Amino acid sequence: MSRSFRNGFRLLKLSQMDFERAWWDMANLFRAPRRVYRSITLRKQNINRYGREDFSFIVLFSCMIVISALLWALFYMNTPKGYVTTITFMLFVDFGAVGVIMATMYYFIAKRFLMKSNDTILSSTDYQLEWNYCFDVHCNSFFPSFVLLYVIQLFLLPVITRDNFISLFMGNTLYLVALCYYSYLTFIGYQILPFLKNTHALLLPIPMFFIMWALSLLGFNVPKHVVDVYFGKSA
């Protein structure tokens, strides 16, 4: 069996996963996200790649998503089919499929528009953009949004779905914060790569989010419509 296959199987062993590091990453994505990416820069010097060494972050994140899905189903789709449907959608669509799409999109954007044109950089294997690193960046960026929209929002729904302006403002602002923080963390993730330029362009969606948020305050309750899309009924 080749070395790459042996390494692949090693990465799938729970005993080989660094869950302590995964917890550290998750905590610092809230309080000091640049520390997470500084540690990635140091890791690059040790193992010569930017992507994570194992799947501990993804495994831990997936477990949290499953628990969150169980709670959502308990409140809004309390049937065996409802539990399976909610877990499947949140884990394999929201996290898996959307993650692959976002990572691939940013991978091609970075390769097409953000790569430095220096011939030395382009020819060096030390400065190759890794798709799995793009997926890691998405996971890092999505985690705070997950906490805001899949955990905190669930318990705030009785308040933020009421028919008054304060509830409208609170609920829509929750989504604004989640989207802006996702974009900011994504920007940090690509900013640390020495072979990319003009990474501030990745912050361009943030003004658009503010415009959409301001327009939504005219009467479009985002949390209420999201629940309706997910579960076919208003909160």
Curated annotation (Swiss-Prot):
Predominant cellular place of this UniProt entry's protein: endoplasmic reticulum
Lumenal side, ranges: 76-88, 162-175, 223-235
GO cellular component: endoplasmic reticulum; endoplasmic reticulum membrane; Golgi membrane
Function: Has a role in meiosis.
Protein name: Protein GMH1 homolog
Disulphide-bridged cysteine pairs: none
Organism the protein comes from: Schizosaccharomyces pombe (strain 972 / ATCC 24843) (Fission yeast)
Residues annotated as transmembrane: 55-75, 89-109, 141-161, 176-196, 202-222
UniProt record similarity statement: Belongs to the unc-50 family.
Cross-referenced PANTHER family: PROTEIN UNC-50 HOMOLOG
Subcellular location per the Swiss-Prot or TrEMBL entry: Endoplasmic reticulum membrane
Keyword terms of this UniProt record: Endoplasmic reticulum, Meiosis, Membrane, Transmembrane, Transmembrane helix
Sequence ranges on the Cytoplasmic membrane side: 1-54, 110-140, 197-201
Pfam families, per database record: UNC-50
Topology within the bilayer: Multi-pass membrane protein
GO BP terms, alphabetized: meiotic cell cycle
